[in-house]
Regions:
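Macrodomain-like recognition of ADP-ribose-binding/processing modules
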Residues: 64-215
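An anion-engaging/catalytic patch
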Residues: 1-67
Length: 215
């Protein structure tokens, strides 16, 4: 298997490429720049995928066989998404910057319960569900302990599993997450985090929308 020595083609990235193909978003008329933008990768990584597609298909066979069609990327604002639940990654220190700051500014009724959860509980690796005034549910996904570039992949995985368990228990059928969750201020690798989202929600009937703001 001839792959680049320092390949950036992770399981999450390759599954995104396969999903684009299967959803019909990819066609030969698209230029490389458009495809790379959809994937969020550079030219070297994209070329690696093209040159070694069969090898990566074998390497990530289980992932390719189980690429979820219930996970979709859509252009739009997370805060206005019409799913049952909207989720975002949070820290355990009660510090709300970036998207979290926008969420709590628009839904101040959820801020104090978030602060109390940080003070009283040990929420790392868990998810707090809160009812918003508009009837939707907010999911505070505790994927990092500290504020800033502190995303912990293991805790993100645990928190996503906790979120799924709670959604199943409450009969909630759809979820919106920010495209790039935990990879902005949180400092994580989106390809890794995407792989975790797919691992938890891919095999389920829960509809997942990854909201990407149009540049």
């Amino acid at each position: 298997m001839v792959l680049l020595n320092e390949s950036k083609v992770t399981k999450g990235l390759f599954s995104r490429y396969v999903r684009i193909q299967r959803e019909g978003k990819y066609n030969m008329l698209m230029d490389a720049k458009q495809v790379m933008q959809l994937l969020g990768c550079d030219a070297v990584t994209y070329t690696d995928i093209l040159n070694n597609y069969e090898n990566y298909s074998k390497l990530y066979k289980k992932t390719v066989d189980n690429v979820a069609t219930n996970i979709q990327v859509k252009i739009g604002n997370l805060l206005t998404s019409k799913t049952d639940v909207i989720g975002h990654q949070t820290n355990c220190k009660g510090i709300a910057g970036g998207l979290a700051g926008d969420v709590f500014k628009q839904h101040p009724e959820c801020y104090e319960p978030y602060l109390q959860c940080c003070k009283i509980n040990k929420p790392l690796g868990k998810t707090q569900l809160l009812k918003m005034n508009d009837g939707r549910v907010l999911a505070n996904i505790f994927g990092q302990n500290e504020a800033g570039a502190a995303t912990d992949y293991k805790m993100v995985l645990y928190a996503l599993k906790d979120l799924k368990k709670q959604m199943d228990s409450l009969g909630l059928k759809s979820l919106s997450l920010p495209y790039g969750m935990g990879a902005g201020i949180g400092g994580g690798d989106w390809n890794e985090i995407f792989g975790l989202i797919e691992e938890v929600f891919g095999p389920t009937p829960i509809k997942v929308v990854l909201c990407k703001l149009e540049k």
